[in-house]
Each structure stands twice: as structure tokens, then as C-alpha cells.
């Protein structure tokens, strides 16, 4: 097997009159950790925020009635972004159980209250969270 590689190098020199644009930092960057993490309403630290996210999900999750006969239980792993305005967005299921259960997890996460946004370098920043959710039929 022969592989041909062709490398093309473009001229990077500029003329004196040429205007060079410098790209600004990406404003839509999503962080995992920032200097000041988002805060759940009424919280002053990250531990309180984590507890309240899980409490909100637990209290507001409604097991889909049509699945009760099947007794589907287990862990759903979801990820979402607390955006610069403090809203939960970009909810995705990384590991699901059933479409109806996964849809309910997405609904509940989207219903999270507005957070105090996270900050990086004193500017609002979007922060991604990943949460394991244990679904049990009760």
C-alpha cells in the first residue's frame, strides 16, 4: 500500500498595506470549570448548587405512566449547559434508558430555574454540567 502525502505551504507574509484581522476570543466557548461557577437560586457555593440541581430533578421527574408495567429502572446520564444568561440549555442524554424516560429527563432539566451565571475573567461564561440520574419506579 502506497500513501502519497502532499504538503502545501502557503505564503504567510503580508504587504505593508494589507490589513490583518485578529480573531477575538470565542464568545460561545463552553467551560467545564470557571473561576466562579453558576449558582442555583439561593445558593452561595458549588456544593449547594449541585445538591439543588439533583433535588429539582428528583422532585419534578414524573415516571411515564405507560411504562409502569415494564418497570424500567436504572441510570440516565445527562449533560446540559448553564448559558451566560443562567438558563439550562443544550440538554443531551449521554446514556439513556428509554425514549420516554429520556424525554422526561430533558423536560425536567429544561425546567431548572435561572441560575446566577458562571464567570470567567469577570465575564459571564457558559458552563457544562453532567449529571447521573437514578430512575426508580415507586
Predicted regions and their residues:
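Charge-biased low-complexity segments
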Residues: 1-138
